[in-house]
Amino acid sequence: MQERIILFDLDGTLTDSGPGIMKASQFALRAYGVERDWQELDFFVGPPLDETFGQFMPKEDIPGAIDQFRVYYHDVGWLENEPYPGVREMLDTLQKNGFRLFVATSKLESMAVQVLGHFGLAPYFEAICGAPGDNTQAGKKVNVIRAALQKAGCTDLTQAMILGDRKHDIIGGKLAGIRTAGILYGYGSREELAQA
């Protein structure tokens, strides 16, 4: 029997979380003396935070910047977010047609659960897998994907795929050995997805 497992990225795929993430990034950068307009920080949406903050500061400052990001995001940023139009209907249709749905995000798992719960989307997913919050390799996309596949009990990788908007989703899916699909309404470009 086919398993038909679909893993979804969260930010830029299920919800438009850009404003909250970009403002939290601005808040964190400002704490380290870097001034940027929040609307210029769209490249923070999707990739792991250590990668994006690494473009602005030395490695030893990154954990502190991530902590600053989380202060803003936990207080305000997570609410500067909304599901993309049609997402609820898509999830409903997929679920009714026997697809098993999971989330695989680089966002903190606890925050992903909170966001999806707030918007009433959590019940569509068998599991919501995200970064553990300890800034380890466990939060890397391929590892989050593998965690979701493990929770799914997936025995046939050809029956699983990930849907996302950034190269990290596509690269992570390929490294995990599953099919990938890029969406163009999020924060990644066609070129970024094609080059992954």
Language model segments and positions:
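Substrate-recognition element of Asp-dependent hydrolases with the DxDx(T/V) motif
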Residues: 90-116
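Conserved Lys-Pro-Asp/Glu-containing loop-to-beta segment of HAD-superfamily phosphomonoesterases
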Residues: 4-5, 140-170
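Surface-exposed amphipathic alpha-helices with a cationic face
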Residues: 88-96, 149, 170-174
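N-terminal helical cap/lid subdomain that shapes the substrate entry/recognition surface
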Residues: 2-89
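Short beta->alpha linker loops
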Residues: 44, 82-86, 107, 165, ...
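Conserved H-loop
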Residues: 35, 121-126, 155
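A short, structured active-site edge motif that brings together acidic residues
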Residues: 40, 122-137
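Acidic, Mg2+-coordinating phosphoryl-transfer loop and its flanking beta/alpha structural elements
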Residues: 162-196
